[in-house]
Amino acid sequence: MLSHLRPALVSMGLFTVLLGLAYPLAVTGVAQAAFPNQANGSLIRDADGKVVGSALIGQVFAKPEYFHGRPSAAGAGYDASASSGSNMGPLNETLIARLKTDAAALRAENPGVAIPADAVTTSGSGLDPDISPANARFQAPRVAGARGVPEKDVTALIDAQVQQPLLGFIGQPRVNVLALNRALDARYPPLASQKDG
């Protein structure tokens, strides 16, 4: 009987070591050597080396002097542990009510301007760090007014932050909200009254 079990036990032990230990360590080693930033979460640090966020996960910016990301379906404030879409269909009453509320708030902010779709819709993961260039330009008047700078300067900053589709055709042009807000702070620091509030 043991002679029948031996090949299975040896195979299980071999593949456990090979696929459960050797392969993950090899992949981790290659990733750390070839792509250390990406392997560690694409973290963004400030001048003091403090982590301020990730280029891959959105975060909440609620103040008027900052660009706001897409709404998040991943819990309160881009909670990565709750990552997922809302799974609400287009006729779901809760979704319709949220869209109407968000659209009304955005219309009050920019009356008479068409609202970009990604300003009111969540992404599939609920953690999207990017917005469309149209969404960023939609927010430019509010940000410029709150910062006390010309809108054309804010729009030029947006244009400089636009990332083109991968290989020219995969995806859509996009703007990383954290990178844009950091560039905004570097170029036009918040007014003294805004720093603490």
Swiss-Prot record:
Location(s), subcellular: Cell inner membrane
InterPro entries in the cross-refs: KdpC
Gene Ontology cellular-component annotations: plasma membrane
Annotated transmembrane regions: 7-27
Annotated family: Belongs to the KdpC family.
Subunit-structure text: The system is composed of three essential subunits: KdpA, KdpB and KdpC.
Function: Part of the high-affinity ATP-driven potassium transport (or Kdp) system, which catalyzes the hydrolysis of ATP coupled with the electrogenic transport of potassium into the cytoplasm. This subunit acts as a catalytic chaperone that increases the ATP-binding affinity of the ATP-hydrolyzing subunit KdpB by the formation of a transient KdpB/KdpC/ATP ternary complex.
Full protein name: Potassium-transporting ATPase KdpC subunit
Organism: Caulobacter vibrioides (strain NA1000 / CB15N)
Gene giving rise to this polypeptide: kdpC
